[in-house]
């Protein structure tokens, strides 16, 4: 078994360095990706509650100026009056890795440099690829032969995760107790009911509820935490998309979205569901998908009690109560609470149906619609009722069916008090009171209250006319 040693993790350990020559070779998209990776690693350290030195390289990246190395930052950050060392946890003996006199960084056999010690942030270091401790776990594929530029595109990046991160809740080294700790969100916002795992995240969020709101969008009134968040929000409203995919030309308003999209072209899907074998390009997608099998919906709306499998779905639902609609169609002016709803709506104007079935050539506007349609060809029915064993092609069909067992009828007619299991059934029923008949036969002009009656009429009365 590899002998473990303990040392201090520095910002440099999670930094990617470039020489001036390497930096000049990068195009704007690559430079933007570099900034995002560096800032993300910096924020991850800060989220642990660690006091970091005021690195001017971070300020430069926030201001989008031209950094290329953190070497100078490390020189400024060194403390000449302090010893640093690694301790053999088996023998208890310590050995210095930097003395007061020399004050030079020492790189160990694994290529990790010991520099400025960070309080409460220590790693256990072994000869393999896993570094773990009570506060931080570091999972890195380290290779001295990989250049910084290659590291960006090959995915050999540093990920920092701790007891307050949910990204790696299914990581094999975590115990059940640690996983349970990760899932807990003890910090709740009294204004909105939103919950957080990290104590520092709550005051950051509560800024949007305070009277002092300097970062407010003058168009919609939305308040964000900082100027970068306001700039990002403004790009959403204006439709600005500065990041372009070189393969297909698709544009994105965030560099992270571009990086995620590029996996479509490379076919990279490293995360696999053990239940059904489905693969995903991101671990967050896998975690969200697995809740289909476990039926887990931990995110509850404090207003109406509705539950969701992810916080993003809850956030989008919350806008129904607030009436907030951030996304506006430039064609017709219609506004939407979710970006995906706007994207779906825009396809109506363009008439685009990019997803085509290889079996019957039928085309669809959405990938999900194609996936559901293909189940008609392959007979796949992945959603099963635990009460009676009946299977369905769509989760919405399963949810609708389960109301038969529960007896739930949440949709009530305000006119006569009759209740229904589905909203569509209520809408059909209300036409009795309103007299509405929206389905008109273009052959004879007869009108119908229900689409099924209209279809039946065409087949029985005008079948010959329609076929000719």
Swiss-Prot record:
Pfam families: KRAB, zf-C2H2, zf-H2C2_2
MF terms in GO: DNA-binding transcription factor activity, RNA polymerase II-specific; RNA polymerase II cis-regulatory region sequence-specific DNA binding; zinc ion binding
CDD domains found in the cross-reference section: KRAB_A-box
Zinc finger residue extent: C2H2-type: 187-209, 215-237, 243-265, 271-293, 299-321, 327-349, 355-377, 383-405, 411-433, 439-462
Domain KRAB: 9-80
PANTHER family registered for this protein in UniProt: ZINC FINGER PROTEIN, ZINC FINGER PROTEIN 37 HOMOLOG
Main subcellular location: nucleus
Protein's cellular compartments: Nucleus
Keyword presence, DNA-binding: yes
GO cellular component: nucleus
Recorded family membership: Belongs to the krueppel C2H2-type zinc-finger protein family.
Keywords, sorted A to Z: DNA-binding, Isopeptide bond, Metal-binding, Nucleus, Repeat, Transcription, Transcription regulation, Ubl conjugation, Zinc, Zinc-finger
Biological function: May be involved in transcriptional regulation.
GO terms classed as biological process: regulation of transcription by RNA polymerase II
Domain of life: Eukaryota
Cross-link (Glycyl lysine isopeptide (Lys-Gly) (interchain with G-Cter in SUMO2)): 75, 157, 179, 367
Name of this protein: Zinc finger protein 766
